[in-house]
Amino acid sequence: MLYRSMLSLGSLLLAVSFHGTSAVGRKLTEEPVVNLGTAGDFAILTKSGVTTTGVTSVDGDVGTSPIAAEAITGFSLIMDSSNEYSTSTLVTHPGKVWAASYTSPTPSKMTTAISDMETAYTDAAGRVDPD
């Protein structure tokens, strides 16, 4: 399930980065880019957790919701004194790790990001394939 979630988001991000040129170089009709909203603030955003074996470097924020921080495994999380986020040596500074189980306002931040991710996915999935 984690693989499917990450694959879906990866497909979404790939679709967003597509610049509207076909394989043979002809220009396609410009379609507005998919608005990621606050989901675009995350390098990894998941509803089901994320795991690493320690051979990972994430350049940006990691977030999970509605599942708790315990679903982020292998990152050796270090909780910030505010309890709003944690850090990891595997998440490049200034990247942070966010989870719905952390102190307010983090749960609200994560709910909004997940909602924005789902809205962006629905938008991208509903578009006509240019090929």
Residue ranges and their predicted role:
Residues 4-20:
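Cleavable N-terminal signal peptides of Sec/SRP-targeted secreted and luminal proteins
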Residues 16-131:
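Solvent-exposed adhesion/ligand-recognition segments of exported proteins
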